[in-house]
Amino acid sequence: MGEKSFKKGFLWGGATAANQIEGAYNEGGRGLANTDFLKYVAPNERRADEATFEQTYASLQEAKAHEDTYIFPKRWGNDFYHHYKEDIALMAEMGFSVFRMSISWSRIFPTGFEEKPNEEGLAFYDKVFDECHKYGIEPLVTMLHYDFPLPVCEKLNGFESRETITLFEKYVRTIVERYHKKVKYWLTFNEINMSLQSLSTCSGAMRDHSLKGLDEEQLTFEVVHNMLLASAKAVILVHEIAPEALAGNMVWKHVYYPKTVRPEDTLQQIFDMNLNYYFYDIQCKGVVPYYLDRYFEQKNIKRNYSPEDIETLKKGKADFLSFSYYMSNISEYQGEPMKFTGLLPDQSRNNPYLKMTDWGWSIDPVGLRIALNQLYTRYGLPIFIAEFGIGMYESMDSNHQIHDQGRIEFVEAHLKQIKEAIKDGVDVFGV
């Protein structure tokens, strides 16, 4: 038997999000999104955790009140809306065979509440997909990547409300019916588990705007459950409308190491990993796992799934799984009740065996191999690595060039570990 490696047809590409690249926030019939009110933060004020981009109702209203004063970078992105042809040509020049991108919900339904979609927005993505296929590039489309129609956030507090599930279903049906002949691979939500740490970014729900007066813990998991239900409904719609297409999930994969060989640290590691697996188990197995029951009881968190919801979760299982991977973390037991370690740099900075990025995130290529083996062993589904990369402080030389050797070495090291995972027997079909 020959040595396993990247198989023929392996998908090589890159990833973007509509709110990061499109710009044209007030063109083509697009409505305002929550991300259009995220203010510019100077480099010396930025933090490597979610506090930099978490939006509250108070901060949103303050930004709206001073709209003429602040800079809102996501309104302009890199102007992909007007330069998608040049951008996709550059992707082809680099050898891309896949382009992970997202559709802006507010470009299709400007407020989220319209009965009929915005044809100009639909036509824009037709042109983008056609341009991709012109170069033999397969679009891999994220349905919702952190940008919501603003009224959905203000009136419904995002996925706190079940009405948002209904609006999302309408949006999903519209885009899948429109593009099912042009898009083979779909992802429902980007990094759905980040709702545990950056609720508004992931779900459109602001912690200080609960319409039901829920405390933060209850609000978070009510939102999580509504998003998981919406994800299942989206998968079901893809299967009904486009049985030839594949619908996947996308989670920020956490890799945790016990801080010591103390048994309690391993117990904490299991708890931390279970909070990550919770999202995979529901989306890949269609079951609501037992292992958070004690945590919910300790926190007095109620799970409001009906029998119909449980059936929907069973029916809406993903065809493949995907994830982002940026660093590994350390689990250290702090007593009962256990607390989620999270993804903040404080937890990744403590590993003496790893180097750190300029942002204090651990550089751990072997952790990617570990992640791939963990997920394939547990679920047996094909895997697409939706994101990995590194943030660096960079500067141009006198010839206006950036010498990217550090990033080249970073990517090379991670690709080698992907190859090792494939040798291990993991079915990885793209990155």
What are these regions, as identified by a protein language model?
Residues 69-83, 160-163:
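Active-site mouth loops of central-metabolism enzymes
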Residues 83-104, 138, 315-321, 378:
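Catalytic domains of carbohydrate-active enzymes, especially glycoside hydrolases
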Residues 97, 106-108, 146-148:
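A short acidic, glycine/proline-enriched capping/turn motif at secondary-structure boundaries
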Residues 77-89, 110, 121:
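Internal amphipathic alpha-helical repeat/solenoid segments
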Residues 2-68, 111-113, 122-430:
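Active-site region of glycoside hydrolase catalytic domains
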Residues 103-117:
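Glycine-rich, proline-tolerant flexible connector loops at the mouths of alpha/beta enzymes
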